[in-house]
């Protein structure tokens, strides 16, 4: 995969239920208030640790606020050598509206 693929909320939810990796690039306050359970909060500060411990062959789904910023982040992960990276269309706002039961606040 040389470029990320944009996927729908439904596709992302299905892949998440199958154990797919979700990285959330929103600001710390938004992430703390609510996020996809099991998501990694990916920031400039946590990126190197994430990359160091990552399975580059495992699919990675990037979520942001509305599905715009995640596109750049997804392409960046591709440039780092990740094989399969997806940008979630609609972002966390759409996820929370469609799957309110599948969100959690930071403990």
UniProtKB/Swiss-Prot annotation:
Catalytic residues identified in the record: 64 (cysteine persulfide intermediate)
Primary localization class, coarse: cytoplasm
Coiled-coil regions listed in the entry: none
GO cellular component: cytoplasm
Domain of life per record: Bacteria
InterPro entries: GlpE_sulfurtransferase, Rhodanese-like_dom, Rhodanese-like_dom_sf, Thiosulf_sulfurTrfase, Thiosulphate_STrfase_CS
GO BP term, example: glycerol metabolic process
Keywords: Cytoplasm, Transferase
Pfam families according to UniProt: Rhodanese
Subcellular location: Cytoplasm
The family this protein is said to belong to: Belongs to the GlpE family.
Function: Transferase that catalyzes the transfer of sulfur from thiosulfate to thiophilic acceptors such as cyanide or dithiols. May function in a CysM-independent thiosulfate assimilation pathway by catalyzing the conversion of thiosulfate to sulfite, which can then be used for L-cysteine biosynthesis.
The protein's name in its UniProt record: Thiosulfate sulfurtransferase GlpE
